[in-house]
Curated annotation (Swiss-Prot):
Protein name: WAP, Kazal, immunoglobulin, Kunitz and NTR domain-containing protein 2
Boundaries of every BPTI/Kunitz inhibitor domain copy: 326-376, 384-434
InterPro entries for this protein: Elafin-like_sf, Ig-like_dom, Ig-like_dom_sf, Ig-like_fold, Ig_I-set, Ig_sub, Ig_sub2, Kazal_dom
Keyword Signal assigned: yes
Length: 574
């Protein structure tokens, strides 16, 4: 009993009046009442049995703070996402022991059907009712569903369908077998076998290639997102996933691997449940076999509901930042609330995540990956850094792509559609275009006016050499070239130069995005230019590329066979 102050001791009338006021909801003067707390009947499943933890994926989306936010037959209970969710309540038996209430004799679920997928019959207030399941087994049995997601097991899929009031079906998990066939057909096969891709002579092994573009995804906090690294190759590539972490070693995840809310399924699909801001970042798929290795980056942005709408409204009007801002290091100092943001990393040629402390010392910080790319990568992504992309079509055309991991051009099979810029008809074309020096990554790749042979024929001089000194001037520049070999010289008499370096004038240079992109170093270059007033001159579209034994041999063959004379007689061939 509460102590009733202000009433005469021993007065039954005073106590009765105070009790009446209390029952009417009017506390007597001087009476201290405890705060009222709204609560539904029953207990949470995890209070009844630790093994009944609320663990269905769908329950994490029905977040709550108190029972008042839930249905009358539900409780607000902790879930595996670290928050609370509305779930069906449990009850104590008549002896006070925790456990489900025994069904009254007059209530039964025997002839009561629940039509919604993922629902089950339960007795509520003496009547059978349908409710969504709030308990799933812990053992993984990855299930591919018709909504395009892979669930931890069948129960998780049913719970998702019930929470949304929809129907989800189990579908065959997508898996693309290697091409060509990894083993010969057995003798007992039919006389007319099914159509298979044609065999390509000499391609006993093919390096991994992607079937689809690695797309950026942006989700709201609490949603589920998945990435499929759809690759082919011979032999079958092994796939691993890792997240690019800030100042920490990356954790490699293989198929059938669970780490927190991140799962890699048995078909190597990466699934992130209940996405949180710290889950944003670059998720890298690595596919490896005996013929080569492929790495593809899948960016993920995780934003709140308000940020998502604001980003959708502002992204079309995004403006590029000055190059100097994009090249500044991320501002990681702590000046207040910490958030996960994106910044442009010139060395990685990509946007990465970091912990932003709101110091605002520079502008190289963005809410989403897309906003970062719009601001600091307004030009096309350097094609030589793109992964080999086969595409969904079935033309099966041999092509070449530059592999930034090995630093070499490798063959792959192109399907004929939806490829990318890292796609060349021959190894020679690939080596002519890749790699190119990485400078300001907002700049497009420098492209010469003509290809190797045509540029050779139309140039006044062609030399093999190294840049020993470079001087920048407004709209121009000067380079000192140590000449290793003179392949062509029509106007300067370079054979009399001896050991002296050749001074080359660079015309119409934009030093924020220099073309040709020459740098001081020991790497041998093929330099083709013009002669103007006795001076060696390079223009933005002049041919300057990495020298190789193959290229040098080809240019010597052009001289020996007098190919340039033939091209002069037939201009249409150039």
């Amino acid at each position: 009993m509460w102590a009733l102050r202000g009433c005469r001791s021993g007065s039954r009338w005073g106590q009765g009046a105070a009790l009446l006021l209390l029952l009417l909801g009017v506390p007597p003067r001087g009476l201290a009442l405890p705060p009222l707390r709204y609560s539904h009947a029953g207990i949470c499943p995890n209070d009844m049995n630790p093994n009944l933890w609320v663990d269905a994926q769908s329950t994490c989306k029905r977040e709550c703070e108190t029972d008042q936010e839930c249905e009358t037959y539900e409780k607000c209970c902790p879930n595996v996402c670290g928050t609370k969710s509305c779930v069906a309540a449990r009850y104590m038996d008549v002896k006070g022991k925790k456990g489900p209430v025994g069904m009254p004799k007059e209530a039964t679920c025997d002839h009561f059907m629940c039509l919604q997928q993922g629902s089950e019959c339960d007795i509520w207030d003496g009547q059978p009712v349908c409710k969504c399941r709030d308990r799933c087994e812990k053992e993984p049995s990855f299930t591919c569903a018709s909504d395009g997601l892979t669930y931890y097991n069948r129960c998780y899929m049913d719970a998702e369908a019930c929470s949304k009031g929809i129907t989800l079906a189990v579908v065959t998990c997508r898996y693309h077998f290697t091409w060509p066939n990894t083993s010969p057909s057995p003798p007992e096969t039919t006389v007319h076998p099914t159509t298979a891709p044609p065999e390509t002579p000499g391609l006993d092994a093919t390096a991994p290639a992607l079937l689809n573009h690695p797309a950026h995804q942006s989700v709201t906090v609490g949603e589920t997102v998945s990435f499929l690294c759809d690759v082919v190759g011979r032999p079958r590539p092994e796939i691993t996933w890792e997240k690019q972490l800030e100042d920490r070693e990356n954790v490699v995840m293989r198929p059938n691997h669970v780490r927190g809310n991140v799962v890699v399924t048995n078909i190597a699909q990466l699934v992130i449940y209940n996405a949180q801001p710290q889950d944003a970042g670059i998720y890298t798929c690595t596919a490896r076999n005996a013929a080569g290795v492929l790495r593809a980056d899948f960016p993920l942005s995780v934003v709140s509901g308000g940020q998502a709408s604001a980003t959708a409204e502002s992204s079309p009007n995004g403006t590029a930042l000055p190059a100097a801002e994009c090249l500044k290091p991320p501002d990681s100092d702590d000046c207040g609330e910490e958030q996960t943001r994106w910044y442009f990393d010139a060395q990685a040629n990509n946007c990465l995540t970091f912990t932003f402390g709101h110091c605002h010392r520079n502008r190289n910080h963005f809410e989403t990956y897309e906003a970062c790319m719009l601001a600091c990568m307004s030009g096309s992504l350097a094609m030589c850094s793109l992964p080999a992309l086969q595409g969904p079509c079935k033309a099966y055309v041999p092509r070449w792509a530059y592999n930034s991991q090995t630093g070499q051009c490798q063959s792959f099979v192109y399907g004929g559609c939806e490829g990318n810029g890292n796609n060349f008809e021959s190894r020679e074309d690939c080596e002519e275009s890749c790699p190119f020096p990485r400078g300001n990554q907002r700049c497009r790749a420098c492209k010469p006016r003509q290809k190797l042979v045509t540029s050779f024929c139309r140039s006044d001089f062609v030399i093999l050499g190294r840049i020993s000194e470079l001087t920048e001037e407004p709209d121009s520049g000067r380079a000192l070239v140590t000449v290793d070999e003179v392949l062509k010289d029509e106007k300067m008499g370079l054979k009399f130069l001896g050991q002296e370096p050749l001074e080359v004038t660079l015309l119409h240079m934009d030093w924020t995005c220099p073309c040709p992109n020459v740098t001081v170093g020991e790497a041998p270059l093929i330099i083709m230019g013009e002669v103007d007033g006795g001076m060696a001159v390079l223009r933005p579209d002049s041919f300057v590329g990495a020298s190789s034994t193959r290229r040098a041999r080809k240019l010597r063959e052009v001289m020996h066979k007098k190919t340039c004379d033939v091209l002069k007689d037939f201009p249409g061939l150039q």
